[in-house]
Structures are given as structure tokens and as C-alpha cells.
A protein has these predicted regions:
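Basic, Lys/Arg-enriched alpha-helical interface segments
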Residues: 1-70, 79-80, 90-127
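Hydrophobic/aromatic beta-strand elements that line small-molecule binding cavities or substrate pockets
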Residues: 73-75
């Protein structure tokens, strides 16, 4: 008989205002995104998670629509012992299909913050 060992749950860390912003989302959006983040905590990738362009592997985005609005959460699973939520925001329509530069820049800055936090709390990331 084969035994399947469950992956250990990685703690979820929120960078900057990401948790406060996430908690402002509609309940249905929080539930769906929360499920995706939970899958990431156990080492998986939710079907709704897509790569975030420009920051390399392990940075993912979940997009949910609700009442004509688009909500996004960007997180990273590139660390061995933790998952970091980098940004949660409602997509602004004036920028069209592209994500606003301020959001792209904020994600990049918060990834650097997450890297520093991870090193401080867990030690150097193995490459």
C-alpha cells in the first residue's frame, strides 16, 4: 500500500497593505482567492493562478471578477518556508487590459521587501 505524505503548510505573510486591501474585497472574491492562496501554501498552484510577468518564476497572480469589477492578488511561492502576498488590488479600467505601472512597480518593490523579510526570519534562500 502506498502512503501519500501531505506537504507541510507554509505560513502566509502579507507585505505592506496587502492584507488590509484584500479584506476589502467582496466575500466571494476573498473566498476564491483565499482558496488559491491556500493551495499555494501547500506547494500547489491553483488553476486560476497565472505567472506574473517580469519578475521570474514563482510570482503568481490570481484574478477574480465580481459585479463587473476585476480583483487581483499577486503572491510569491519562490521561498522554501513561506508564501508572501505582495499586493491585492481592484483593477482600474482606465489602464485598459494592462496593469497600471504603479501596481507593477509596487509588486516589484514588495518582492524585494519579502526577500529581505524572508532572509531575516528564515535565513538565506537556497538557490
Amino acid at each position: 500500500m502506498r502512503r501519500v505524505l501531505a506537504a507541510a503548510e507554509k505560513p502566509l505573510h502579507w507585505v505592506g497593505s496587502s492584507k488590509r486591501d484584500f479584506l476589502r474585497f467582496p466575500a466571494a472574491v476573498k473566498e476564491d482567492m483565499g482558496n488559491a492562496l491556500g493551495i499555494g501554501q501547500f506547494g500547489g498552484t491553483a488553476p486560476s493562478a497565472k505567472p506574473w510577468k517580469g519578475l521570474g518564476p514563482g510570482v503568481l497572480e490570481v484574478v477574480e471578477s465580481h459585479d463587473g469589477n476585476a480583483y487581483r492578488a499577486v503572491y510569491t511561492v519562490r521561498f522554501e518556508k513561506a508564501v508572501y502576498v505582495l499586493h491585492a488590488f481592484q483593477k482600474e479600467s482606465p489602464s485598459g487590459i494592462r496593469t497600471a505601472k504603479r501596481d507593477v512597480d509596487l509588486v516589484a518593490d514588495r518582492l524585494k521587501t519579502a526577500e529581505r523579510d524572508y532572509e531575516e526570519h528564515f535565513g538565506k534562500q537556497k538557490r
